[in-house]
Amino acid sequence: MEIQAAFFLNPMFFRFCASHCTVKFLHKLLNHHGLVLPVPLRNNETEIGEIAMEQMELKKLQILSAKIRIDILEMLVHCGQGHLGGAMSLVETMAVLYGKQLHVDPKNPQLEDRDMVVLSKGHAGPVWYATLAECGYFPKEWLFTLNQGGTKLPSHPDRTKTPGVDMTTGSLGQGTSSAAGIATGQRMKGSKRYTYLMVGDGELNEGQCWEAFQYIAANRLNNCIVIIDDNKRQLDGYTKDVLNPFSIPDKMKAFGFHTEVVKGQDIEAIDAAIDRAKAVKDQAVCIVLDSIKGAGVKYFEDMVSNHSVKFNNDEVIGEEKKAVENLQAWIEKEEPSCLS
């Protein structure tokens, strides 16, 4: 008989283990049921109770990621086409930012002293819209107006139209300079907030990116956290074939950035990398996401041209429907364990 995850996430279970179980035994038990217990640990109630909360938080971010993926798929199939691949590769990063890391207020999107987000790869707007809707910035019904006349959700982000969008982007490269300016302004005001700049690997074809990076590094803007979505593909092919970027991490290090690489679909790794980035002083910081374009749905991951997908035949629509059903079934199974 399957044991529900809620049983393992219950603090009472961990209190029992603190008194009656070894940490080694607890590792084996949780791993058997698909949960992870970090090491090393002391075998005491306080620390094991903290792990219960960490597992709960991780599960909530995983569920948020699944909901964002569903929203992206459903809004694009309703629209008939859209930028799927690069939106899906950023799902986990957006979930970590808005689900945990950002100092923002959905009820007050223009909060004066808030963290700022710049999605320089503006064609990935659907992942931003889905995240904002899930976090309560606007009604989810708006998602089905994507790129339609009179919409508040244009194909590329527009700060004058969408609550929660801090900068208009879409012309590749320009968001990097905008983020550099915003971070400079934050520093001049003495703000302790951060600017999160998300850039695509294909976008690095634009020279403006490197001009902005040089400025960010030279001015040691450690409050501007650069996140590069290295999903290996762009509009017209693989990045290595269009204009080989060689080693993006080496380039960023050479520019003066404290740089690390994490798996782009690993929530815990992304979250930990952002924590480490915030701890860096007197140096610009960059996180390179080793990500998968179209991530989360094998059919779309394997699609050769998944930058922009047309939902205009039975096969593609059928795969979208199957993916949504699978994600919804997983949420229905896992979400009860996270309800307080």
Model-derived segments and spans:
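Generic beta-sheet signal
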Residues: 115-117, 193-197, 224, 283-291
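Cofactor-binding active-site loop characterized by glycine-rich and histidine/acidic residues
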Residues: 72-75, 87-218
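Thiamine diphosphate
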Residues: 164, 168-280
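N-terminal capping segment at the start of a domain
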Residues: 65-81, 229-231
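Glycine/aspartate-rich loop-and-adjacent alpha/beta segment that forms the canonical ThDP
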Residues: 267, 273-340
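Short, Lys/Arg-enriched N-terminal segments with co-localized hydrophobic residues
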Residues: 29-52
